[in-house]
Regions:
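Bacterial N-terminal signal peptides that target proteins for export
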Residues: 2-12
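Hydrophobic alpha-helical segments
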Residues: 11-12, 22, 116
């Protein structure tokens, strides 16, 4: 087997392992403030891909496995592809990327305090301060 094929296999294995670890950690859910109106999955994808500004997206850190899982399930793109989209949008002055917060508690706090904010966390982290608007399985 060539070195390139081994590298590709290693990358694919790492990607699958990353998605599996997020899935094993728990179901990822999209949340908004308790009284907010739930948008469609398409609107959520558009917000996180910079195509819509009707909501304020919140992001978990790049190191959080739920982030990769969320982007794959919500936008059909991996986190690196989404990062490239936001690099282009930022460079051309057309927008700012989602606000990156430290952890699920920070996402819940931001979402609960702003009816236009949207974020994603593990289902196990949901409490009465936020409303689940979409489950990603």
């Amino acid at each position: 087997m060539s070195k390139v094929n081994r590298n590709i296999r290693g990358f694919v294995f790492a990607a699958v392992l990353g998605l599996a670890s997020a899935a094993n950690a728990g179901e990822v859910v999209v949340v908004m403030a308790a009284g907010a109106t739930a948008p469609s999955k398409d609107v959520i994808a558009n917000v996180y891909l910079g195509r819509s500004t009707e909501l304020k997206p919140m992001d978990l850190p790049e190191s959080n496995p739920a982030r990769q899982y969320f982007y794959k399930k919500a936008t059909d793109r991996d986190a690196a592809q989404v990062k490239a989209v936001w690099s282009r949008i930022t460079f051309t002055g057309q927008g700012k990327p989602p606000k990156e917060l430290a952890d699920a508690a920070a996402v819940k706090k931001a979402v609960a305090s702003d009816p236009k904010a949207i974020g994603y966390i593990l289902k196990a982290d949901v409490d009465s301060t936020v409303k689940v608007i979409l489950s990603l399985e």
